[in-house]
Amino acid sequence: MKFLFGLLLVSSFAFADCPQLYPDHKPFNIPNTTELCNSFYVSDYDTINHKVIAVSELLKHNFPVGSVKRTNNFHSDDRVGSVPNNRQYLKTHYDKGHMAPADDASSLEEMKETFLLTNMTPQSPTLNRVEWKLLEEKVRGIFDSSKTDVYVVTIAVYENKQTINGLPIPSGYWKIVYADNSQYFFYADNNDDAVVVQRGSVALPSLFK
């Protein structure tokens, strides 16, 4: 499968600690980010502005995705220090919204990794609990019917430069699914009135602001 977004690609000679977790095994070319490798997903994290830019998941064919009980144990990521942390989300309007969903985990270790705060963004509660949750279920349905491994890329778009308690707030999200040589594109704004929209091949907005 070919990763369409040239904006996100680097040359085949670029270094990556976990290239197998990216579509086409090619890391994202996102300035000022640190690659945080986990068991089944990798997060490209901006350690200067304390925000996750993109997450790529590898859902292995025939793995028991979605079979692990949810833990809800949100915790800081020692690889980037004490920020972000749970205190920053206290008394805000926002949920801790997963980039790589907890329900995509197929083991206890994977479940634990999905609750790293480097896998979170401040997300509208309505979007997180309704529209985005339905999209995540739709993606797992695509995976369940797939005959091959599936890659899922989730991108947080930061167009408004808004923050809360030092946490940058995404203006919206893309989710791109690569399954059986097909590609599925979804987008939603990050607000309580948002609706997830499925699109064809698209020109992405600027991702790196």
What does each model-found stretch correspond to?
Residues 3-13:
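Sec-dependent N-terminal signal peptides
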Residues 14-16, 23:
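Boundary at the C-terminal end of the N-terminal hydrophobic targeting segment
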Residues 19-20, 36-38, 47-54, 169-171, ...:
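Coil-to-beta-strand transition motifs
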Residues 25-30, 38-42, 138, 172:
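Short alpha-helical segments and helix-capping/turn motifs at coil-helix boundaries
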Residues 31-34, 165-167:
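Short Gly/Pro-enriched turn/cap motifs at secondary-structure boundaries
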Residues 34-95:
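Short, His- and charge-rich active-site/binding loops that engage polyanionic ligands
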Residues 78-209:
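Domain-level detector of nuclease and nuclease-like folds
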